[in-house]
Amino acid sequence: MLFGRLTERAQRVLAHAQEEAIRLNHSNIGTEHLLLGLMKEPEGIAAKVLESFNITEDKVIEEVEKLIGHGQDQTGTLHYTPRAKKVIELSMDEARKLHHNFVGTEHILLGLIRENEGVAARVFANLDLNITKARAQVVKALGSPEMSNKNATANKSNNTPTLDGLARDLTVIAKDGTLDPVVGRDKEITRVIEVLSRRTKNNPVLIGEPGVGKTAIAEGLAQAIVNNEVPETLKGKRVMSLDMGTVVAGTKYRGEFEERLKKVMEEIHQAGNVILFIDELHTLVGAGGAEGAIDASNILKPALARGELQCIGATTLDEYRKNIEKDAALERRFQPIQVDEPTVEDTIAILKGLRDRYEAHHRINISDEALEAAAKLSDCYVSDRFLPDKAIDLIDEASSKVRLKSHTTPNNLKEIEQEIEKVKNEKDAAVHAQEFENAANLRDKQTKLEKQYEDAKNEWKTTQGDQSTSLSKEDIGEVIAGWTGIPLTKINETESDRLLNLEQTLHDRVIGQNDAVTSISKAVRRARAGLKDPKRPIGSFIFLGPTGVGKTELARALAESMFGEEDAMIRVDMSEFMEKHAVSRLVGAPPGYVGHDEGGQLTEKVRRKPYSVILFDEIEKAHPDVFNILLQVLDDGHLTDTKGRQVDFRNTVIIMTSNVGAQELQDQRFAGFGGGSEGHDYETIRKTMMKELKNSFRPEFLNRVDDIIVFHKLSKDELKEIVTMMVNKLTQRLSEQDINIVVTDKAKEKIAEEGYDPEYGARPLIRAIQKTVEDNLSELILDGNQIEGKEVVIDHDGDEFKYNINEKNNGISDEGNEVTETEA
């Protein structure tokens, strides 16, 4: 907290506040202790103003002890509560508004008055202090000394009126204490001071990625000037932040912009104590240069070269390269200073420096573990932004979320409010109907409810009081999960059970294939428990096997179990990438080609959904160059698109399916179903497919894959299970049209028999169901049979399929409603 600007009396107030907290055995210094501290300084303006309202020290002590009482024996260091910190911030704000250079007891009192929550506010309410009159009394007691300060400030800057209207004086803002502290940038600030102290071309330009803290360095320089931590050459200088948009705004006629900029330059030259700071320096190039007029950069060049104008610029690497470097004459007038992204450790130090500001704003406590989690998790999971900006935003949003959650009006208050509104409407209706006795009863009921509401509200506020809400590591995880979709919160019991039973969930959709299901499930559990390699994808797999055994279906089932819907899967059909030139569509077209601005089909989807299942279907159909792109994805977990953006694949499950070797198996008569024993068949299939896989793909590609799984052929029993699954899906579809079908076991066996094909796996079952069930049902409907609201029983008598139409839930077949397959 910024206590350097407090008067001696105000500092004594804070010391008294600490003593009062110790006397009352409280573990924190709150607003009530600040109030007691004010009362301990009877000669201060604050105490005198309160005394004029008949508020004495004894009364305040009595109220405080009544409201919160004495605590237990307190140990350790005393800390200010977030609300007390907010009061100090408000008191500084009051001093700035009154143009006072220091914070006194009167400003602390104004801060307490503005902070309308907390124990001090309740003490004022209990002692019937009129807040508006008290504030007016403080301002009156101050008299007019502030006007002299105001005039002094005005006189200091009245020699630069144009500049003052277009720029912000960072040194004045730093003096007011409203700039955030700058942590860990001493090296860069020293380098800026060295360049500014040169005789000519003394213009540093801060170059770095967005969000690394370039503007903060200029603010740090302003704070160093205010604190006299600069060489003699820079003492007394003013750092003015100029926005080129403001300079251009309103210049309707030719020459107005140039005249305005020239006037600013003349004022800076005459004042001799101004350092100009231009954020987004690249906006100089072309600014005000419409219709052949000279732009801002060309107007400033002579003054920049001669050293008449000291300018600090800030811009990103890309903008510097595109706008500044192409103008060699402008580039040589600036000295580049590289501002690198801070490390995670440096970011934690920066967050600790900013903690007080965010605690005071959100009125919560921010723990060290929350700061560390914000730095580490944002570094790990938010790959398209830079530290410390993304970590600061994370702390800010998480603090806001916690604050709002803890201060939401409880349900019982909302219910009483609704009841009051209801009674009020009934009372108005009774008055309108001239039922005055009923209206009087309702009025009494309303009064009773309003009293009940006030009591409940006061009780809720009392429990809230100065109770400190803390920001934890879990809160940070929740917010970053909301940003990215990656689950980072603590695993709860429900999710734990779901992960442990993932195999069973997948088996509900994928029949057989235990090896594949187990391998996938283990990879997902490793990732969710935080044990996976942080630099690689969650898992990468190649699924081999003949067609129709469930390779693609397993990927769909995994997407549904992880995200609740199949559409969450990113599917890339590799048959679309058979030509060499089509490979670029994955990462985006190169510059100069059509579609460069659209991004890649794969990279754009993963950028938007970094936590996903990616299915590369039928990989043997793709051009070999595709697998060169996948090498770095499998090994390093990232891919760079054509715009130079790094796309993070570390939170994806990569599944590749292939039928490689299936043709050779068919030639060997081992594909599909039947043949020798199950074990012998599987080993032959496995050896053949692995051999073909090694012939088709490079070893460096296969070596990067976590697991290569050969799918088993499907047995007849498994086929029957698949038929049951397919029939259930059909039943669900038909139930939406109020048609209920029942397929008997005999019919299912016949469908499985008809759909049995050693070459094509389970896919012929779809055709068999279409032929035996869907086609005949559609003919029944078109033939005039009213089957809506009825039950259709599909059976097989050994020769043909039979369709019995029953009344729903009747259980008795109507003799005249039996239809054979041939009749249908």
Curated annotation (Swiss-Prot):
The keyword Chaperone applies. Residues 417-452 form the UVR domain. Gene3D superfamilies: 1.10.8.60, Clp, N-terminal domain, P-loop containing nucleotide triphosphate hydrolases, UVR domain. Keywords: ATP-binding, Chaperone, Nucleotide-binding, Repeat, Stress response. CDD domains: AAA, RecA-like_ClpB_Hsp104-like. GO terms for cellular component: cytoplasm. This is ATP-dependent Clp protease ATP-binding subunit ClpC. It comes from Staphylococcus haemolyticus (strain JCSC1435).
